[in-house]
């Protein structure tokens, strides 16, 4: 995307996010109770995680948020996954403005060469889950497309009230995808439905309008967390199963 177009899109999204936050504070949607329901997670050191990381959770917040915004459901999921119950998960969240930093962090867990990964290499690589809110939805799919160029699969992508010019098509390396959107002042700009680059490779799990949610509070919809946790549980079950033929 040209820098001028990116800047124009980012500024528009940022200004409208401000307006949305002012007109529709999260408390107005009755979802703030979800914040207190998220337990504080015990933290395992990054070095310990990197040594045993089998699943990567990479989240992107909205354009106006700090990457560690405690009110964002994207961040809250990551905090849970950094707890002692998930020693095999590496989880981080980033601003969409520095989405390449998130990509670089993710790729540190993969072979260093720049070419396509072989099936043998992928057997020893972590599984990837991507979640993005607002302009973070665009950032998330930008990461997925970069991974596609190396044949790195993505187990799950979730777009949450996504805002962006190139966030309509889910790339073929994504196995399952979902989109959640709200009815609020940003509605004219947010992505409502997705296209699949290759329907034989990608399955849409959810296309949901979250009633009563605003552009910020939608990130705390429990179904988003549930999709992430279900995917992790399924991946863990696959790790435990013996290879076919044994």
Give short role names for the model-derived ranges.
Residues 57-59, 88-93, 157, 177-179, ...:
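Conserved beta-strand scaffold positions in the cores of enzyme catalytic domains, especially
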Residues 33-34, 42-126, 215:
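Active-site catalytic motif of lipid deacylating hydrolases and related acyltransferases
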Residues 72, 76, 101, 105, ...:
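Extracytoplasmic/secreted proteins, especially bacterial periplasmic and envelope-associated proteins
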Residues 2-14:
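Bacterial N-terminal signal peptides that target proteins for export
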Residues 12-24:
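Bacterial N-terminal signal peptides
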Residues 81, 88-89, 106-194:
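Serine-dependent carboxylesterase/thioesterase catalytic core
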Residues 172-246:
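C-terminal catalytic-base region of ester-bond hydrolases, centering on the histidine
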């Amino acid at each position: 995307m040209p820098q001028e177009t990116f800047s124009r899109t980012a500024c528009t999204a940022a200004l409208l996010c401000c307006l949305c936050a002012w007109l529709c504070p999260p408390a107005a949607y009755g979802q703030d109770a979800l914040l207190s329901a998220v337990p504080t997670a015990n933290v395992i050191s990054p070095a310990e995680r990197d040594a045993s990381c089998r699943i990567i959770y990479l989240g992107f917040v909205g354009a106006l948020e700090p990457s560690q915004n405690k009110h964002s459901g994207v961040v809250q999921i990551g905090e849970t996954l950094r707890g002692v119950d998930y020693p095999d998960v590496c989880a981080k969240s980033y601003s969409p403005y520095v989405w390449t930093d998130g990509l670089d962090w993710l790729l540190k867990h993969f072979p260093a060469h720049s070419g396509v990964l072989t099936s043998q290499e992928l057997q020893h690589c972590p599984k990837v889950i991507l979640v993005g809110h607002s302009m973070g939805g665009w950032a998330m799919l930008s990461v997925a497309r970069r991974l596609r160029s190396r044949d790195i699969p993505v187990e799950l992508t979730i777009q949450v009230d996504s805002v962006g010019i190139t966030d309509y098509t889910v790339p073929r390396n994504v196995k399952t995808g979902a989109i959640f959107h709200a009815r609020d002042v940003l509605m004219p700009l947010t992505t409502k439905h997705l296209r699949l680059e290759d329907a034989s490779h990608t399955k849409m799990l959810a296309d949901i309008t979250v009633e009563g949610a605003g552009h910020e509070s939608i990130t705390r919809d429990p179904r988003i967390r549930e999709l992430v946790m279900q995917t992790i549980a399924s991946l863990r079950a696959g790790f435990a199963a013996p290879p076919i033929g044994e």
